[in-house]
Amino acid sequence: IYLAVLLLILGVIGTAMFIVYQSENIGKQVAGIFEGIEEVQPEQESGSAEAEQSEKTHSVKGTGERKVTILSCEVLPDGTQFALKGEADAFPESDDNNLYLLAMKTYEDAVPEDAVPIARAEKKTSFMLKADILDNTADSRLYSKFVVAVKKDGKYEVLSTPQYITNPEALASYSEPYPKAESIKGLLVDPQKLGTSELDDLGVKQAAYNIPIARLLGPSTHSDYPTIIYNYNGKDYTLNGHVVSEYDYVFKTLSDKGIVITAILLNNKSDAYPQVIHPLSRGGNAYYYAFNAAEEAGTDYLEAVAAFLAERYRDEEHGIVMNWIIGNEVNVRSTWNYMKYVDIDTYAREYARAVRLFYNGIKSFNANARIYISLDQQWNRNLSSDSSYDSRDLMDAFNECIKEEGNIQWGLAHHPYSYPMTWPKFWELTGEAGEMVQESEDTSMVTI
């Protein structure tokens, strides 16, 4: 378990400070005052926001009791293949004695009717299926999810829940250890002041910087900084060389000072690149929007952004970013991660898709990078999801989605505002504030 408190003045996104917490299973919760999370249950099928499935697909949701338990889905030591291991007490009758491995895209909820198996193995109570990863090719499986099936009457019958590769760091050529910061003191930095002595004078050793991803996309906006053509997974992407030069300057300057960097990936609206906005988020009016990992065009761009940033910011030439936060206060649905109203399970699942995508992309280049979700201080207020969800409820739902499809070491970037936010003496709370902030896992608010 890694626990670090980053005190960041995040005026741009309205965050005074946050606690970063990372654990393999999130066994304990923020600030060290909570006892734990109940064992998650299989993801429940949600209703209204689900797209209707084509008749030419094999559903992998709502299929009843799973016949196969997946034990692991990991990159093998050679770095070119992965292995999915599983077990079952028995198998249904089928056309042959084989188990088949089928691949699905991040955005798919069902196996296409014309799917071709990528591996097969004999039916055994303990089994392993191996296939090529094909990293950074048009057929890459780094971001895919996989199901085990048998063939029945010439069609594939899915026996397992989808599973992603859970150790993308095995592909990374950069594996320097996570740095130990000299101090927890940090700032959201102003690039115009990086040339001054302010960071040194203040003793800052942690820094955060916002990356609205649509700024990266498109041709350069300055003749001195050529447009960057980045090829990933067989496709070319046009990136703004002028914007990239800004990030180069910021991250290189901070790295040279021995400052641990946190990049906050935000999904701003761009008329030129609507595909990065989730289909349930278009037409809204907010600061930032939900990432689109629900459609092919969106996932392609998000994969390319994740790969470019992680590949570029892992060396001394451009600076080293070790912390990546996906979105800002995503439980505040209407403002910071806009999506039209959906139930919390649907919302969590769509966010989990995006986090998983960034996780696999970033860690495939930087093995010890850390990836976080972002929640605010409204822990257990029984909020109406017309605008926001309680942080605890969303974290539980998100954790359920992640564990169901292959557990990973995600972290929590928590924003522990004082309550009320205009009250600076957070250690002296009386009246309503004293009732809202308690040392209990059922507290309404979690503050510093």
Residue ranges with predicted function:
Residues Q29, I33-G36, V305-F308, E350:
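Charge-rich, solvent-exposed alpha-helical interaction surfaces
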Residues S140-R141, D200-G203, G406:
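Flexible, charged surface loops at secondary-structure boundaries
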Residues K56-G64, G258, N368-R370, S374:
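Generic detector of solvent-exposed, compositionally biased contiguous segments
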Residues V305, E317-M322, T346-I448:
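Noncatalytic carbohydrate-binding groove/subsite architecture in carbohydrate-active enzymes
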Residues E93-S94, P219, D271-Q275, R381-L383, ...:
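Short acidic, gly/pro-rich beta-turn/loop elements at beta-sheet edges
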Residues Q81, Y107-P112, G154-A310, G319-I325, ...:
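N-terminal substrate-binding region of glycoside hydrolase catalytic domains
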Residues I1-Y2, L6, G11, T15-Q192:
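Mature N-terminal, pre-catalytic/accessory segment of carbohydrate-active enzymes
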